[in-house]
């Protein structure tokens, strides 16, 4: 899961 927003 990527934590980029």
Swiss-Prot record:
Its main location: secreted. One of its GO terms (cellular component) is extracellular region. It comes from Arabidopsis thaliana. It is found in: Secreted, Cell wall. It comes from the Eukaryota. This is 18 kDa cell wall protein. Keywords: Cell wall, Secreted.
